[in-house]
Amino acid sequence: MVDSLWHGFADMGSVVANGRFVVARGEGTRIWDTNGNEYLDATAGLWFTNVGHGRTEVAQAVADQLTKVAHYSGFGDTTADITVELADRLGDIAPV
């Protein structure tokens, strides 16, 4: 695996010497590596898993949206209807 995947932020010398930390699954705030060891996912909220792993209602909402449109650029004066809907909902609850 070390030969086929070089992550841009990894210390590859350490990976070669000590092996790679590979996550196999997650549930809520916990993750498990490929050896079955369980960890608290302390970096879950870093980008996009701040709602936890394995949330079937989130997976279903994503699947539903992907059948409509996966992504549309917000550059210029274009956007997607779901983006407008989210902005309106956030505007309704944001303390501004």
Predicted regions and their residues:
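Active-site-adjacent loop/helix segments that line or gate small-molecule/cofactor pockets in enzymes
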Residues: 1-27, 68-69, 77, 82-83
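Active-site and channel-lining beta-strand-loop segments
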Residues: 20-41
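Glycine-rich loop-to-alpha-helix module at the N-terminal edge of alpha/beta enzyme cores
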Residues: 38-96
